[in-house]
From Swiss-Prot:
PANTHER family: 39S RIBOSOMAL PROTEIN L12 (PTHR45987), LARGE RIBOSOMAL SUBUNIT PROTEIN BL12M (PTHR45987:SF4). GO terms for molecular function: mRNA binding; structural constituent of ribosome. Forms part of the ribosomal stalk which helps the ribosome interact with GTP-bound translation factors. Is thus essential for accurate translation. One of its GO terms (biological process) is translation. InterPro entries: Ribosomal_bL12 (IPR000206), Ribosomal_bL12_C (IPR013823), Ribosomal_bL12_C/ClpS-like (IPR014719), Ribosomal_bL12_oligo (IPR008932), Ribosomal_bL12_oligo_N_sf (IPR036235). Pfam families: Ribosomal_L12 (PF00542), Ribosomal_L12_N (PF16320). Belongs to the bacterial ribosomal protein bL12 family. This is Large ribosomal subunit protein bL12. Homodimer. Part of the ribosomal stalk of the 50S ribosomal subunit. Forms a multimeric L10(L12)X complex, where L10 forms an elongated spine to which 2 to 4 L12 dimers bind in a sequential fashion. Binds GTP-bound translation factors. NCBIfam families: L12. The lineage of its organism: Bacteria, Pseudomonadati, Pseudomonadota, Alphaproteobacteria, Hyphomicrobiales. Signal peptide: none annotated. One of its GO terms (cellular component) is cytosolic large ribosomal subunit.
Length: 124
């Protein structure tokens, strides 16, 4: 126990530059990277802070085409400007994003259009 206390005392006496050099030496000796652990540990906190703010950009996601697939394809074409084949592939490959990075009002409007055509839509 006395040895551990001596190590703690020695580490506490290090300057910031000495501590950084010690970290580099330990990374080389043990073959690890402290930067990766810091990035992983910081990520959950950043996500929680972003979730607390009100979302301003939305992605309109086509969850399912429903019974009126042709009507949904027409709406997807009108919204996205895609060709017939691309719109058909998007509808048949649901769930897929139809439009990304739109504001709340536009997202709600697009959702209503697609639901009126018979699609099941999610906003993310």
């Amino acid at each position: 126990m006395a040895d551990l206390q001596k190590i703690v005392d020695d580490l506490s006496a290090l300057t910031v530059l000495e501590a950084a050099e010690l970290a580099k030496l330990l990374e080389e000796k043990w073959g690890v990277s402290a930067a990766a652990a810091v990035a992983v540990a910081a990520a959950p906190g950043a996500g929680a802070a972003a979730a607390a703010e009100e979302q301003t950009e939305f992605t309109v996601v086509l969850a399912a085409a429903g019974d009126k697939k042709i009507e949904v394809i027409k709406e997807v074409r009108a919204i996205t400007g895609l060709g017939l084949k691309e719109a058909k592939d998007l509808v048949e490959g649901a769930p897929k994003p139809v439009k990304e990075g739109v504001n709340k009002d536009e997202a709600e409007k697009l959702k209503a259009q697609l639901e009126k055509a018979g699609a099941k839509v999610e906003l993310k």
